[in-house]
């Protein structure tokens, strides 16, 4: 998700905690966390689950997400994988 120099992760933690708390408070958020990969220091992974596409869209448009992007936007982003778990086989 996000590649941060390991010596800068600690300064980013308060912003991560704020993003986590605000995202979890969204009505359409089922699960949300940001975590540093223990095997790769500086790699911040996001794990997010939303009720539906509208909830994901609302998250992306939220003020707290925009604030997180303003702080984290300076760091390179890795590829991401989106899974649609709403469809039944």
What annotation goes with each model-predicted range?
Residues 1-3, 33-60:
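Short, well-ordered beta-strand segments in beta-rich or mixed alpha/beta enzyme
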Residues 8-30, 64-68:
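Short amphipathic alpha-helical segments
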Residues 33-42, 68-89:
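Glycine-rich beta-strand-turn "strand-cap" elements at beta-sheet edges
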Residues 15, 35, 59-62, 71:
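Residue-level signal for well-ordered alpha-helical positions
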Residues 1, 63, 88-89:
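Short flexible/disordered coil segments
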């Amino acid at each position: 998700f996000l590649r941060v120099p390991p010596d800068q992760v600690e300064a980013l933690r308060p912003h991560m905690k704020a993003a986590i708390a605000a995202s979890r408070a969204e009505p359409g958020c089922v699960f949300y966390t940001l975590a540093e990969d223990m095997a790769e220091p500086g790699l911040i992974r996001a794990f997010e689950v939303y009720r539906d596409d509208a909830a994901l869209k609302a998250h992306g448009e939220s003020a707290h997400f925009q604030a997180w992007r303003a702080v984290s936007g300076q760091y390179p982003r890795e590829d991401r994988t989106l899974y649609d778990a709403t469809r039944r086989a």
